[in-house]
């Protein structure tokens, strides 16, 4: 199997290119401490990630408060606290996974167009790309708030293929989460699952991506 006929590679961000869990956890704990709730560990926060910022905050609150229903007012307030806390630590401890830089270089030299499709708020993407010095690899990116729908909806994938003047057949999605694989399936697009990411502590192969890789560097053999 290889994907040398593709023109566009659509990457997920958190759990695929970068490990941002340390900073997401810091921001979540800042929010929880505001409500005099106990801090969570990275391990506890990991399965809450993948659907965007608000679901992350909601899951952390539900986990911490256990019995009470989380009101919309509480969630909105907690989200604001989390959002401003995350702004302060966006790239404090976030790092690229092993092999990402070399592989992006390789794919770039081969002439593939590369973009990012994330369920992270759009405004946080660029500061991280800048800090890690990888912005130049990507033609554009969309976040959870860029369009009216986010992954697992196919809309962001159609949008990116369209923006890059290519077809679904010539595009491929690379991600660690079921949302990435389901979005690709909803768009009738091929997909590559990476096994080292978050994915709610579930096995990515359960969602039937076209192929699964265990490290980012493995992509060099597929393109």
Segments predicted by a language model, with ranges:
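Asp-based, Mg2+/Mn2+-dependent phosphohydrolase catalytic module
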Residues: 1-6, 122, 127-223
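Active-site neighborhood of HAD-like aspartate-dependent phosphohydrolases
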Residues: 2-47
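Generic enzyme active-site microenvironment
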Residues: 10-12, 117, 174
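Substrate-recognition element of Asp-dependent hydrolases with the DxDx(T/V) motif
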Residues: 16, 100-129
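Short alpha-helical
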Residues: 23, 52-55, 102, 123-124, ...
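Residue-level detector of anion-binding/catalytic polar loops
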Residues: 38, 113, 190
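Metal-dependent phosphoesterase signature
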Residues: 61-102, 110-112
């Amino acid at each position: 199997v290889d994907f040398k006929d593709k023109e566009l590679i659509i990457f997920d961000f958190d759990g695929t290119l970068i490990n941002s869990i340390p900073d997401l956890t810091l921001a979540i704990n800042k929010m929880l401490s505001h409500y005099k709730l106990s801090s969570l560990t990275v391990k506890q926060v990991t399965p809450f990630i993948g659907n965007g910022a608000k679901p992350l905050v909601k899951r952390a609150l539900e986990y911490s408060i256990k019995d009470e229903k989380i009101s919309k007012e509480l969630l909105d307030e907690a989200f604001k606290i989390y959002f401003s806390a995350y702004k302060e630590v966006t790239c404090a401890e976030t790092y690229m996974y092993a092999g990402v830089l070399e592989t992006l270089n390789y794919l770039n030299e081969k002439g593939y167009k590369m973009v990012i499709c994330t369920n992270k708020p759009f405004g946080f993407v660029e500061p991280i790309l800048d800090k890690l010095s990888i912005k130049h690899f990507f033609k554009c990116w969309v976040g959870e708030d860029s369009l009216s729908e986010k992954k697992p909806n196919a809309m962001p994938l159609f949008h990116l293929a369209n923006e890059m003047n290519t077809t679904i057949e010539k595009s491929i999605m690379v991600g660690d989460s079921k949302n990435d694989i389901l979005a690709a399936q909803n768009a009738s697009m091929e997909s590559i699952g990476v096994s080292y990411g978050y994915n709610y502590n579930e096995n990515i192969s359960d969602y039937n991506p076209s192929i699964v890789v265990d490290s980012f560097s493995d992509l060099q053999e597929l393109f």
